[in-house]
Amino acid sequence: MKPAVKRLALAVPIALAVPGTALAQAYQCRVPDRIELPRPPRQDSTTVRAPVARYTLAVSWSPEFCRSQRGKAANDYQCSGKIGRFGFVLHGLWPEAAKGPSPQWCALEPRPSIEDIRTNLCMTPAPSLLEHEWAKHGSCMAVTPAGYFKVASILWNSLRLPDADKLSRREGLTAADLRREFVRRNPGFTESSVGLQVSNGGWLRELRLCYDKDFMPTPCPPRGFGPKGAVPLKIWRGL
């Protein structure tokens, strides 16, 4: 077991002590009886091995993703409605370096098992993405896919995510409004720990939640923090 997994195992009681923990962000997610392993992921950039200084938990707003990605085979579970209708889903957990390129593509083996995919499909409803996230990011912080997904799921299940549908109807919604609502629901965070990724048109794509190497919320680096303060924000409902 790598140090990252050990540290989070010790933090489990803290994570689960958060009041009102959300159990899932899927609408009636139903794991299919039969799941096929996707093709092995293709390494799309060079291997980087570097000390891990912090982590990013990337939480995707599924209606915005599916708005442009619906109809693609790799996104069928997430976007077709066959196994459920999704709001926020987990994109991935990424180890980050203090400076310079972050760790990536440390190993392509072992691959996630069918059981790994089945266990985590309602959290990340795309088998090919689960494969990719393990190979590109998880292999640099855990020995096995199961260990990596355990860390990610503990962080995921400790969150109380905002009611994005309700926020989307607020007139004059800003980036600060979303950050304040997230912090209200998750008192361990500050607004500086909540990065946002938006489209060129100002639509919410992802929350980028920042943790230190002990998996405690920490201020995000300026790069990638996203829109600040009173910058207008839009949220596509699509449900």
Residue ranges and their predicted role:
Residues 9-17:
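Bacterial N-terminal signal peptides
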Residues 71-239:
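Domain-level detector of nuclease and nuclease-like folds
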Residues 1, 17-18:
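Extended repeat- or IDR-based interaction platforms in eukaryotic proteins
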Residues 1-10:
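Bacterial N-terminal signal peptides that target proteins for export
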Residues 20-24:
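Sec/Tat signal peptide C-region and signal peptidase I cleavage site
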Residues 25-66:
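N-terminal module-boundary/linker segments of secreted carbohydrate-active enzymes
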